[in-house]
């Protein structure tokens, strides 16, 4: 049986990337929360 996670940079960026996060209100909230927490990486 194959594993469920098959790594793909393109799919990763398209679903969890910075631009995708900025498109929705909820996504922007995620970015802001990570900024407030002091995360080094905000998105992927």
Swiss-Prot record:
One of its GO terms (cellular component) is ribonucleoprotein complex. Pfam families: Ribosomal_L34. PROSITE patterns: RIBOSOMAL_L34. Gene3D superfamilies: 1.10.287.3980. GO terms for molecular function: structural constituent of ribosome. Keywords: Ribonucleoprotein, Ribosomal protein. GO terms for biological process: translation. InterPro entries: Ribosomal_bL34 (IPR000271), Ribosomal_bL34_CS (IPR020939). It comes from the Bacteria. The keyword Ribosomal protein applies. Belongs to the bacterial ribosomal protein bL34 family. This is Large ribosomal subunit protein bL34. It comes from Variovorax paradoxus (strain S110). The gene is rpmH.
